[in-house]
Amino acid sequence: MKTNEQAYEDLLFERDEIDSRILRLSNFIDDVHNISKLSLHQKILISIQLQAMKTYKEILTARAADIAIYSSKNSK
């Protein structure tokens, strides 16, 4: 079973990985000079993927904060 500290570190690592993916996707969007040539379907999929990753990052951040609060309460 993971300790709170291990779970916290795992969440932060996963959050950083998601942040990296968000940055890569954002850069891809910026680098595509002919974004207007993408189909509406492709634009919608990219938008959904980007929003899903941002939401997941927020969830990971909240879970990490919960663990930090729980750990600090139990260490007193």
Language-model segments: what does each one mean?
Residues 1-76:
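Extended, charge-rich alpha-helical interface modules
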